[in-house]
């Protein structure tokens, strides 16, 4: 179907791109994450209500809720089995890959549920993949952006390290999709 030029009287022209969604930039880091937008040609970090731009990449799974960031850190002292940090290291990794990491992981691997190659961790009675845990971090960042911008955020550009292989990149995309973000 052909699209025709729309001509309006002066002062009656609709705002261009008024219905477009905003795309955000996300640095999903191993230790900390942040979310930003481009404002007047420069990046602007979206800060939380606490004024902080950085969000620790830490997730606590409590009985009734998921807590992300600085609020999850205190749980680490009292109930470390409920907290996950540095999950990015396991993105796109299979069960066999864990053997190459050396040392013991601070998490219990759910061996029964990990069949088929995808790592599943047993955290606070839940069986979670690194993708699901990363999605919780991305969801918290998305919520921060929506509060700061007072609009829905559905699109994002997410940075990944150069060493990420195709599996880790795909896992990051899957996490974004679970969080409601199109990459």
Task: Tell me the role of every PLM-derived stretch.
Residues 1-56, 61-183:
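N-terminal phosphate-binding loop and flanking beta/alpha elements of the actin-like ATPase fold
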């Amino acid at each position: 179907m052909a699209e025709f030029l729309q001509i309006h009287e002066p002062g009656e022209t609709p705002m261009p791109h008024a219905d477009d969604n905003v795309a955000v930039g996300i640095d999903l880091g191993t230790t900390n994450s942040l979310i930003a937008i481009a404002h007047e040609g420069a990046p602007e970090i979206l800060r939380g209500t606490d004024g902080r731009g950085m969000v620790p990449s830490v997730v606590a799974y409590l009985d009734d809720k998921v807590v992300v960031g600085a609020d999850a850190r205190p749980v680490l002292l009292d109930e470390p089995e409920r907290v996950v940090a540095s999950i990015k290291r396991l993105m796109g990794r299979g069960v066999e890959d864990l053997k190459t990491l050396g040392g013991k992981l601070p998490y219990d691997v759910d061996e029964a549920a990990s069949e088929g190659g995808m790592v599943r961790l047993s955290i606070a009675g839940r069986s979670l993949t690194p993708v699901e845990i990363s999605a919780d971090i991305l969801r918290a960042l998305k919520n921060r952006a929506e509060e700061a911008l007072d609009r829905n955020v559905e699109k994002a550009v997410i940075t990944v390290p150069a060493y990420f292989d195709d599996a880790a990149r795909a896992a990051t995309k899957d996490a974004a999709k679970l969080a409601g973000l199109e990459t």
